[in-house]
Curated annotation (Swiss-Prot):
Protein name: Flagella basal body P-ring formation protein FlgA
Subcellular location field: Periplasm
Membrane-traversing stretches: none
Tagged with keyword Ion transport: no
Gene: flgA
Record bears the keyword Magnesium: no
Signal peptide: 1-24
GO cellular component terms, semicolon-separated: periplasmic space
Length: 222
């Protein structure tokens, strides 16, 4: 009789443990899908580790996740889990493997970066420095603020836009309205890249705000 009770207890424990593992797995799996959509991750090599302890009987069929002011896309991330009327704070670790950009050769400070300066490699994304570029297109035509060495990951803190217009430069200002266009010459009051807003001062002292086009002209729409 005692032997039967022992086997029965072990059986119940096994079912509970299996159910708990399935719940934890399902939550991690749902988090994986959330991060893939949130960060547009194409990689299949993604793993989410939940660091916040959950109750053993916790289960949520349709959880809703929300990011909490995160500065990082990978590594330790703060999440709000909404399950019906329940709100839970989770600290999770996102591990992912995918492509990112490194310098193919030494890039001297002040260089307008080109495609042949770069190369893509595959590795752990969660161990990269903050703001690392994952796509070449986001980096090409930017200017590096310091020397970048071969095989070094490149971050957004190491580059700036390429200035089409520089501070105090004389620029063509085009004021555009319905069926008319007026052209002036003005002085830029700051540096500016293509499609950026910039303020210019006309000869009469009036200050206008416009958008820089690819010809280094400032377009003011009325």
């Amino acid at each position: 009789m005692k032997l039967i009770k022992i086997f029965f207890c072990l059986f119940i424990f096994f079912l509970f443990f299996k159910s708990f593992k399935a719940t934890a797995y399902n939550l991690s799996d749902q988090l994986n899908n959330f991060f893939k959509k949130e960060y547009s991750l194409k990689t299949k090599n993604i793993k989410t580790i939940i660091h916040t302890p959950l109750k053993k009987n916790f289960f949520c069929k349709k959880p809703v996740f929300s990011l909490v002011n995160n500065l990082h896309n990978f590594g330790i991330i703060d999440i709000i889990l909404i399950c019906g009327s329940q709100h839970k704070y989770l600290q999770v670790e996102l591990q992912a493997e995918g492509e990112y950009v490194i310098a193919k050769k030494k890039i001297l400070r002040g260089t307008k970066i080109r495609g042949d300066d770069l190369i893509k490699v595959v590795g752990r994304l969660d161990t990269l420095p903050r703001g690392a570029y994952l796509n070449e297109k986001d980096l090409i035509n930017r200017v590096n603020l310091r020397d970048i060495f071969p095989f070094q990951p490149i971050t957004s803190f190491m580059t700036r836009p390429y200035w089409l217009v520089k501070m105090n430069q004389l620029v063509t200002v085009k004021m555009k309205g319905v069926d008319f266009e007026v052209i002036f010459v003005g002085k830029s009051l700051s540096n500016g890249a293509e499609r950026q807003k910039i303020r210019v001062q006309l000869k009469n002292g009036k200050v206008l705000t416009g958008v820089i086009n690819n010809n280094s002209e400032v377009i003011v729409f009325l």
